[in-house]
UniProtKB/Swiss-Prot annotation:
This is Adenosylhomocysteinase. It comes from Coxiella burnetii (strain Dugway 5J108-111). It is found in: Cytoplasm. GO terms for cellular component: cytosol. Substrate binds at T64, D139, E164, K194, D198. Binds 1 NAD(+) per subunit. Its cofactor is NAD(+). It is an enzyme of class 3 (hydrolase). The gene is ahcY. GO terms for biological process: L-homocysteine biosynthetic process; one-carbon metabolic process; S-adenosylmethionine cycle. GO terms for molecular function: adenosylhomocysteinase activity. Its main location: cytoplasm. InterPro entries: Adenosylhomocyst_ase-like_sf (IPR042172), Adenosylhomocysteinase-like (IPR000043), Ado_hCys_hydrolase_NAD-bd (IPR015878), NAD(P)-bd_dom_sf (IPR036291), S-Ado-L-homoCys_hydrolase_CS (IPR020082).
Length: 438
């Protein structure tokens, strides 16, 4: 694949790898649309009303085929956008090219340097003729943090941000506590139709896909440590066990640890398993989960990867002085002084997007339908959202699920008036309290 780095000119407001990939990208976007019923339903519902007319959205989320469907949905609903990727390895260059060919300002390519990554984010915050954003759409919190720290003058015109992932939500709550958050935020991650679907079912498929593409290793019979048993860890553990691995879990939370034990997993510590496991997967959203000391103990040819947002769950920095042998894109062997080799996937960054193509379109339709609804909420009803961190109301969460039922052949039972009265709900929902745990 060519990588001639198409850059912006007087008539081209984008920076991507190769515009010649656009036709391939467009074909895959059209296929993805058939698997994203939630977004397509929003297009049909709002194509005339244009509820995002006047919105100028700066987006920072993995520039994939599925994200292309999201971007074009936002635009069909009236928004203008400028976009970068939230990970240096996650861009699908044909997706970026397909959008750039249509004149959409995209600043993303697979294999950015750190410096290029931040320059791409900066490019989304200002455009021709004084363009600046009045909404943000973020994944991981880098766009939000960059805006607050480097461009505070923009904050007074920003109606809010919708945040996609656990790591970004943690950062939002920290900023709110510190008083540095200057606009409202909607926590999309904690919508049930995001966290219980994207995080769990998405990872259940994309983790194995990425390990297989990267290594061709036999999963059956392997001892695998999954660090973290939240929704992401749960999905990873399910798929690894289904392939015949013996799965071990590390956890800090006694509730999650007990859940893992009740599912039949061994709950252990990294210190206990570092010298005996074959594959290690971090899924915590935290730092220093696999340390240099752990990696010194690991056996030859152990595989190390991360499916959390950032690259600090595994202490990759401590390996930089060792010899690295590249096997293929995003697959490296790190050779220790004693000759031992560890296989490191995606340099410790998101393995499912570095070594594969991320989650399937259908589950991303759940997440991205939430994102569109969050953007509409922030744009249409700013008076409802003083500075703070919010989740979408239950009726919208249920609506997202409802939009996806037909695609999987599911039919709902309808409550009678008597039944609805008996349990104290409206026949049309919401059917659960805000505090219900699915």
């Amino acid at each position: 694949m060519e990588n001639d780095m198409e850059t912006a000119t007087m008539t081209q407001d984008y920076h991507i790898a190769n515009i010649n990939l656009a036709d391939w990208g467009r074909k895959e976007i059209e296929i993805a649309e058939t698997e994203m019923p939630g977004l397509m339903a929003l297009r049909k519902k709002y194509k005339n009303a244009k509820p995002l007319k006047g919105a100028r959205i700066a987006g920072c989320i993995h520039m994939t085929i599925q994200t292309a469907v999201l971007i074009e949905t936002l635009m069909l609903l009236g928004a203008e956008v400028r976009w970068s990727s939230c990970n240096i390895f996650s861009t699908q260059d044909h997706a970026a090219a397909a959008l750039a060919q249509k004149g959409i300002p995209i600043f993303a390519w697979k294999g950015e340097t750190e410096e290029e990554y931040w320059r791409c984010i900066a490019s989304t915050l200002e455009g021709p003729k004084g363009w600046t954003p009045n909404l943000l759409l973020d994944d991981g919190g880098d766009l939000t943090a960059h805006t607050l720290q480097k461009h505070p003058e923009l904050c007074q015109n920003i109606r809010g941000v919708s945040e996609e992932t656990t790591t970004g939500v943690h950062r939002l709550y920290r900023m709110l506590k510190e008083g540095s958050l200057k606009f409202p935020a909607i926590n999309v991650n904690d919508s049930v139709t995001k966290s219980k679907f994207d995080n769990l079912y998405g990872c259940r498929e994309s983790l194995i896909d990425s390990i297989k593409r990267a290594t061709d290793v036999m999963i059956a019979g392997k001892r695998v440590v999954v660090c973290g048993y939240g929704d992401v860890g749960k999905g990873c553990a399910q798929s690894l066990r289904a392939y015949g691995a013996t799965v071990y879990i590390t956890e800090i939370d006694p509730i999650c640890a007990l859940q893992a034990a009740m599912e039949g997993y061994r709950v252990v510590t990294m210190d206990e398993m570092a010298d005996s496991a074959d594959i290690f997967v971090t899924a915590t959203g935290n730092t220093d989960i696999i340390t240099h000391e752990h990696m010194l103990k690991m056996k030859d040819q152990a595989i190390v990867c991360n499916i959390g947002h950032f690259d600090n769950e595994i202490d990759i920095a401590s390996l930089q002085d060792y010899q690295w042998m590249n096997i293929k894109p995003q697959v490296d062997q790190v050779i220790f002084p004693d000759g031992k080799r560890l296989t490191v996937l995606a340099q410790g960054r998101l393995v499912n997007l570095g070594c594969a193509t991320g989650h399937p379109s259908f589950v991303m339709s759940n997440s991205f339908t939430n994102q569109v609804l969050a953007q509409i909420e922030l744009w249409q009803y700013p008076e409802k959202y003083p500075i703070g961190v919010y989740v979408l109301p239950k009726h919208l969460d249920e609506e997202v699920a409802r939009l996806h039922l037909e695609r999987v052949g599911a039919k709902l039972t309808t409550l009678t008036e008597k039944q609805a009265d008996y349990i104290g709900v409206d026949p049309e929902g919401p059917f659960k309290s805000e505090h219900y745990r699915y």
